């Protein structure tokens, strides 16, 4: 979850949106692109109820600086579409949709469910030797095109280093919202990292050691993805992911028969319940979904926001970052914050959920941010504010902006950004941030195992909050799961056998792991422990 001060501040309901104040100096085309959403926003402000206006005005009173920040709508990325001849395969959704089969009772039915007519999948076999990333491992890159809505999602597939004919397939998603999954590829769990010389370095602990992995830049206008339109909530993005997987497995049926898992971190705590539910809602599908893994996620804000104060004030296993006065201030703000989140849960209205995000983030995350401590790791200061505290993220961006890299993978955009904060704000202004996506998890547990894991040094999506929401979740196994004790998690698969790497509790299809010494990005901080639990999870040890 990416939180910057600008992300947390917006104008109150009574503040007029100055005409194009945000886009002075932009070409007229850019102004035209923004005029309609800004006009729509102004019109919607006029329709607010008195209660909603009071709520927004209260936020403005507490955080007057927010009056200076109005909604930002993302401009399209500059791009040049490559000709069809560039691609080795183009899978037409309309062709897939047109395939009918005979059902068990002799009736005609579509081979796969879903509305796929508007989608195409473009595929290029990428030469591993061209970039020196996992030489000898089969790779595909390309785009999922939603031709109806002018959306183009970039993906990068790496085959398993081990036994690709039998190893499972995993979709990896970074969060944000609005951050590229290529960050996960090169900073965390992919086959290579990028060093200070902007060169790829082989990763011994890559997750494609025993699984094939797809890294997806979503939603649109993130990483190498682009669009003339925008996605501003999690549900809208779910349709695209289902289409991508359906067309990919149609082109490569050898992977479709393998077990499939979805993994991700941070705001993927929103994405994954929705994406998995979307997949499972289609009874006729070619996606063999077996489990989901959510790392340091934001899934149940009402429960998780309870635990910012304890984590910041010394109750999470690390020394306090804040002084007593700041901790007391957070305690004082919590009841109002929780009341606002409850209202969001009850209505799921943007006009209620947006003020909850602004108030709670300023009151409960803001005090920590102002210390200069890394929100993704309580153990140290933010070392590079321009790259979300990590110099390595800057190395990744510099590498992915190289012309030869973009050419090798078939990227169609003129540049790469690790995170698009316009997207971040769009999701916030749609009210998506505080919505109760955890309510989808019981439905998942009825069909597949769910793993919640958390590096215990993270503040922003900390282990205390993730453990708490998993225990508070209402499902048939809640009592047994909540009462289960944390047990030691130790290495079993290499020469460090017996080394304690964390704690685990599990019942039925639900499992929680605390990973020692991991921040927000566990595979980066604890690569050995990360690969250990990942291999054992996809191997079915806990389900």
UniProtKB/Swiss-Prot annotation:
Proregion span(s): 18-124
UniProt-listed Enzyme Commission number(s): 3.4.16.5
Gene3D superfamilies found in the cross-reference section: 1.10.287.410, alpha/beta hydrolase (3.40.50.1820)
Disulfide-linked positions: 179-419, 313-327, 337-360, 344-353, 382-389
Keyword DNA repair part of the UniProt annotation: no
Localisation: Vacuole
GO CC list: fungal-type vacuole
UniProt keyword Translocase present: no
Sugar-modified residues: 210, 509
Reactions catalysed: Release of a C-terminal amino acid with broad specificity
Residue positions of the active site: 266, 458, 520
Any GO molecular function: serine-type carboxypeptidase activity
GO-annotated biological processes: proteolysis
Family to which the UniProt record says this protein belongs: Belongs to the peptidase S10 family.
Job of this protein: Vacuolar carboxypeptidase involved in degradation of small peptides. Digests preferentially peptides containing an aliphatic or hydrophobic residue in P1' position, as well as methionine, leucine or phenylalanine in P1 position of ester substrate.
Stated name of the protein: Carboxypeptidase Y homolog A
Organism annotation: Aspergillus clavatus (strain ATCC 1007 / CBS 513.65 / DSM 816 / NCTC 3887 / NRRL 1 / QM 1276 / 107)
Originating gene: cpyA
